[in-house]
């Protein structure tokens, strides 16, 4: 049963929320904007309401497997199974099987959902940092990177020991930086696109 639950976690993560919203609006988001199937590209291309919808949907792809699959599989929540379900959901989001393993998002929203289930207080800290930086600078990528830095720090302060959750948060943070490597280059060059506030178009 745990093996089946692992597969379910990956399949849930693979649901291409941004792709489906784009298709519902008559476009393939892989061919417009940044080409990324994430909430930021939806925000820039279709506006803040579809962008918010995709962000919440992608976050739930991480939250629900961690919350529900341990009960389904008859295993303990948290470490190691809850974490494994969450990591596979993130992997599915970045490399979705329904799109043949290509064209996924960068994992930020899904990772947020994972840590909402595993560590709510660090989640709030990281999300707060993301929102503040993104609103002030209008760079969603910079907000994601700052949030990724804050997450393991907040987990360390919560755990007060080198627990598996600390290690996982560090790995997730490093993974977010890896998926944003092109954004980092554009930020350094001053070529990164800004997001728009609600009521505006990118």
Predicted regions, residues:
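Nucleotide and nucleotide-moiety/phosphate-recognizing core
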Residues: 5, 50-56, 60-99, 118-125, ...
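Cytosolic, membrane-interface loops and tails of multi-pass inner-membrane proteins
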Residues: 21-49, 103-104, 183-202
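N-terminal signal-anchor transmembrane alpha helix
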Residues: 1-24
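Interfacial segments of multi-pass membrane proteins
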Residues: 43-47, 69-73, 92, 106-137, ...
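Short, non-helical or kinked segments that cap or interrupt transmembrane helices
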Residues: 28-39, 99-112, 139-147
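Loop-to-transmembrane alpha-helix initiation sites
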Residues: 124-126, 140-148, 161-172
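Alpha-helical transmembrane segments of multi-pass membrane proteins
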Residues: 9-14, 70, 88-93, 130-134, ...
């Amino acid at each position: 049963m745990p093996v089946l639950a692992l597969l379910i976690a990956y399949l849930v993560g693979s649901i291409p929320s941004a792709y489906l919203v784009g298709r519902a609006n008559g476009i393939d988001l892989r061919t417009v904007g940044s080409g990324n199937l994430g909430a930021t590209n939806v925000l820039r291309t279709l506006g803040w309401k579809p962008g918010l919808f995709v962000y919440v949907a992608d976050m739930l792809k991480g939250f629900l497997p961690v919350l529900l699959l341990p009960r389904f599989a008859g295993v303990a929540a948290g470490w190691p199974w809850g974490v494994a379900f969450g990591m596979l959901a993130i992997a599915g989001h970045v490399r979705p099987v329904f799109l043949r393993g290509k064209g996924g998002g960068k994992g930020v929203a899904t990772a947020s959902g994972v840590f909402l289930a595993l560590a709510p207080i660090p989640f709030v800290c990281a999300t707060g940092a993301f929102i503040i930086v993104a609103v002030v600078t209008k760079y969603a990528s910079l907000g994601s990177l700052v949030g990724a830095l804050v997450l393991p720090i907040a987990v360390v302060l919560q755990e007060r020991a080198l627990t598996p959750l600390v290690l996982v948060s560090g790995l997730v943070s490093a993974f977010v930086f890896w998926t944003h490597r092109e954004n980092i280059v554009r930020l350094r060059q001053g070529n990164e696109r800004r997001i728009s506030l609600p009521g505006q178009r990118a």
